[in-house]
Amino acid sequence: MASLLSTQELSKQYGKQKAVHQVSLTINKGEICGLVGENGAGKTMLLRMLSGLISQTSGTITSSKNCRMGALIESPALQPNLSAIDNLRYMALQLNLKQADEKILETLAIVGLEDVDPKKKSKDFSLGMRQRLAIALAILDDPDFLILDEPINGLDPVGIKEMRSIILNLRNQYGMTILISSHILSELEMVVDRYIIMHKGLIVKEFSKQELEQTLEEQLYLQTNNHPKTLTTLEDHGIAYKIDKDYISLSSDTNVMNLIHLLINHEIEVKEIFKQQMSFEDYYLTLIQEGEEHDTLL
């Protein structure tokens, strides 16, 4: 995939506080990336730097030639006393767009606001309608790269479904590359190709949707009365495993009865054995814990 935008050791510091610390990442053309982190992780600060709203303390941002950018950062910047169509007309004037009326009607249709009462002021819109109007403002100039800061946050299930549909359509039908942030991993499950996990200003993990699905596959968990001897026995018999806190994690395809017989033959007592699939939330918390451990080394 060709790179659309990349950063190298991008940092933002206020006094001694490192809001964003040495972030190096690449956004590829045509993908939807999910930037995930708890409140205060530095997501919005990073997005504000990428969109050019604030400057970095150090590091570089490189984008492909003639890359146009649109952004919805934090609260939608709407004109509360204007209707949806007049909000877009106001933005079109700022952008000096030609054939603006035709483009405005097309954009309203993209976000599902084409049938809204033209006299209804945006201050009277529902949250979902305001978010969709904000996206309309961000895409009015046909950006190549679209930044969306928590556009799903606070929406009801219907609003979430509508927003996901809009985001996928912008990529699939209009070729936009999208970076979307959230503090909830599962919110992005249906739309993103790749996840970027952020914690305390750092990127702690990046993985594709396929890699996440593999990580969350059902696993066999084992606990015995002799942890070191169990690991040695598994290694001697070529059985792959991972350490997961107090448990030993094995493939769900492992033959349980054969495993138990093997351990009994080596005088190892099985205290607990069960199959379980890791949740999005559990995996996310594991990554945050890894981030905490990394942070102590800085």
What do these predicted ranges mean?
Residues L146-E150:
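Catalytic Walker B motif of ABC-type/P-loop ATPase nucleotide-binding domains
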Residues S51:
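Helix-to-loop junction immediately C-terminal to a conserved catalytic motif
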Residues V36-E38:
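The feature captures the beta-strand-to-loop junction immediately N-terminal to the Walker
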Residues Q219-E290:
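Short, charged/small-residue-rich alpha-helical element at the C-terminal edge
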Residues R164-I248:
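ABC transporter nucleotide-binding domain
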Residues R89, D101-D117:
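Conserved ABC ATPase "signature" region
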